[in-house]
Amino acid sequence: MAPRTLWSCYLCCLLTAAAGAASYPPRGFSLYTGSSGALSPGGPQAQIAPRPASRHRNWCAYVVTRTVSCVLEDGVETYVKYQPCAWGQPQCPQSIMYRRFLRPRYRVAYKTVTDMEWRCCQGYGGDDCAESPAPALGPASSTPRPLARPARPNLSGSSAGSPLSGLGGEGPGESEKVQQLEEQVQSLTKELQGLRGVLQGLSGRLAEDVQRAVETAFNGRQQPADAAARPGVHETLNEIQHQLQLLDTRVSTHDQELGHLNNHHGGSSSSGGSRAPAPASAPPGPSEELLRQLEQRLQESCSVCLAGLDGFRRQQQEDRERLRAMEKLLASVEERQRHLAGLAVGRRPPQECCSPELGRRLAELERRLDVVAGSVTVLSGRRGTELGGAAGQGGHPPGYTSLASRLSRLEDRFNSTLGPSEEQEESWPGAPGGLSHWLPAARGRLEQLGGLLANVSGELGGRLDLLEEQVAGAMQACGQLCSGAPGEQDSQVSEILSALERRVLDSEGQLRLVGSGLHTVEAAGEARQATLEGLQEVVGRLQDRVDAQDETAAEFTLRLNLTAARLGQLEGLLQAHGDEGCGACGGVQEELGRLRDGVERCSCPLLPPRGPGAGPGVGGPSRGPLDGFSVFGGSSGSALQALQGELSEVILSFSSLNDSLNELQTTVEGQGADLADLGATKDRIISEINRLQQEATEHATESEERFRGLEEGQAQAGQCPSLEGRLGRLEGVCERLDTVAGGLQGLREGLSRHVAGLWAGLRETNTTSQMQAALLEKLVGGQAGLGRRLGALNSSLQLLEDRLHQLSLKDLTGPAGEAGPPGPPGLQGPPGPAGPPGSPGKDGQEGPIGPPGPQGEQGVEGAPAAPVPQVAFSAALSLPRSEPGTVPFDRVLLNDGGYYDPETGVFTAPLAGRYLLSAVLTGHRHEKVEAVLSRSNQGVARVDSGGYEPEGLENKPVAESQPSPGTLGVFSLILPLQAGDTVCVDLVMGQLAHSEEPLTIFSGALLYGDPELEHA
């Protein structure tokens, strides 16, 4: 995306420069005319005051805007690179290891800046702005002419209202050049449109890649870290770069031609002025109009290009936002799936979701439908005998039940099912949020549905009556048909039977459709009943909350009244205490005044006078003021103490009043929060009721559509002429089915008798088993007694063994007797064993060397040597390969022994030895190839056609990655392999070249075997 944006902006800059060369910006300021505004269209002639002579008087400063680009750091990206060893281990086992590195990511930013540029003033041209505009025609007049109306200046500097252009004449060569320039601009516009189409195609591919990435993320597959980019994107980018380079070259050529044309126009104007002065108001020429159109087209192309760039940027931003939104959506979906899985694990189905009466009716209906289906199946199996016998009898079988009675029973059951739901709807109270308005509408819709069902049942009853009459006529016709000789009407009977079979199948399908429709209606009634029950529960909870709110409001009003009464009491008490305190203060002031007057009137000394010889202690100790009369006197102290006590009571009253007010404020705040919660709960209940109302409306609409479809089907069935005949034959088949049902009933009774006999035999078997169990219990008891007896016998044997052991320990030998006479000599015994060997003797002298012996016999021929297998292979790649993984070299050039698998690209060593392995990997141009040679899933060697890239962040950062030149990657090494080792080439990055001629080859051969590797 970055190269595409960079080249597009570069193209827009070139087009802007070309437009600027054709038309100068209107903001120009002359530094020598003394005017601060823009220059007049007439140039120097429009000014009355003469311009000062200066060398640079024809140059003006213009404020221009430029778009500059800069390289900014855009975060850090990670990339994976292969390394043979871990970090800091010089010697390590040769295995494939990948390491993740960080490197800065850069982006190209664009900014519009203003700059001052020196250009030729309006009306001047040339390389050094020395070419002045052409003077006016006619003799010079001393009186100044009125200034012309300002107009938009053209390229030559003359005003648009002049009758002649300032080019000094237009020749055929100039018109041809202008026409060529116009054609070139048109071709450039077409190329820009083609480039826009290519960019749109690239954006489409980007959208496909984004969609594929999202699908991969949803499916749980991840792209490998070292996977290469798509080759189609690189090829498209290379093509875009090539086209942009061509456009750059053409724009430069056009810019040069425009410069030459401007210079030529300037020279022509100067020469034309010397030959024939042009009038002051010359009309614009066709060349000027063409140049103006060229300027407009260039500006439009630039604006379109900039708008396209902005659109691509916005589209890229939208794609990024969509990716983020899809990631968030994926995360929310996964979270929801986990939540649903947890709910499914912890959730148990309700014990009773439906009424037992409704379940019983549904079970009975299903049972009857199963009976009908089974009867039809039995009929199709025995149609040869049963139908023939029934047709020969020519009458109705016993137990005949018409289809009308069955449909009427189904209708009664459906009405009985809808009855409780209608009663619940009638007894349902009105609810807020439009529930009271919805319930009458729903009741009306249910009544309409009931009327429609009644109409349908009436029409079906009438048609069934007609069908009964037609069935009777058909049975009589069938009896007349079957009354003849059996050999004459065999073909007609077979046709009738086949037609009956087809019609029976059709009737069965129609009955199943009717049953499914009734089942759907019953399910809808159940759903509506469940919805009504849920609404009733919600309204009940809302009523409880409203009652609780009423109680809370009443309590709140009572507490407000009590607080108001208490406030009134406190105000009265405070006013009374205030009056009493003010009166006490007045009395205290009067008493203080009287005391002050008494002190002033008192002239007698309080102490006796001292004599001249009296000491300091003659007069006795001085007396202090009386207690209670130091500040206040009389009863004023007690009054103040009483006033202080009353004020303390008032303060305590105010404190309790403040506490009560705080509690009241807290209660009011809690009531506000409760009211807010109740409001939110009410809003949720109203929204839930509205949702349920909408669902009920949708369900009613759907039911109306279904009944409308049922009516249309009924009308279509009524228009069918052969339906009555089919139903008549179906009625006859139903009569025969009743006969079959009677036979099945007899079979059931016989089976019941057999089952009763089996139960009797089972009871006898149980009795015999009980007797045998009693005998087995006796045997088990006898075995228990036998065990006790065996234990006693074992103890007796143990006692006997102990006694025998004691007897064996006793010495039973008697005293020694007298010695007897000597006996005769015995026989000679056997020889004794050999003694130990003696010490070796001394070595004798060595004898002389004997003569050579005769030649020995020829040995037996040895076994033949083990055959060495011939192992060699060579394979090439003929199919495109760009995905990372093992490269399957499918075109086999040589495969001695068949140890190379072309489908997987893996070579398996048959025996241990030294093998020569080589591979030549050819990549696409401007795209490097990176691969690894693996031995038994372990990397042995690595090749990178782009060259060695140092590891680390100290490399010089670049704004964009340059395409690497396409080179070869070659493997050639000798490896020791054991029997069963596998060797393959794993592609890490890039795209391999494929063709009929071998470009990418993988080869190997056995050099010699090594038995030591087998024992290693």
Swiss-Prot record:
GO terms for cellular component: collagen trimer; collagen-containing extracellular matrix; EMILIN complex; extracellular exosome; extracellular region; extracellular space; integrin alpha4-beta1 complex. Residues 56-131 form the EMI domain. Residues 814-864 form the Collagen-like domain. Residues 821-839 have a biased composition (Pro residues). PROSITE patterns: C1Q, EMI. Distributed in tissues where resilience and elastic recoil are prominent. Highest levels in the adult small intestine, aorta, lung, uterus, and appendix and in the fetal spleen, kidney, lung, and heart; intermediate expression was detected in adult liver, ovary, colon, stomach, lymph node and spleen; adult heart, bladder, prostate, adrenal gland, mammary gland, placenta and kidney showed low expression whereas a series of other adult tissues, including skeletal muscle and different regions of adult brain show no expression. Residues 135-182, 257-288, 383-402, 416-435, 811-863, 942-961 are annotated as: Disordered. Its main location: secreted. GO terms for biological process: aortic valve morphogenesis; cell adhesion; cell adhesion mediated by integrin; cell migration; cell-matrix adhesion; elastic fiber assembly; negative regulation of angiogenesis; negative regulation of cell activation. This is EMILIN-1. It comes from Homo sapiens (Human). The gene is EMILIN1.
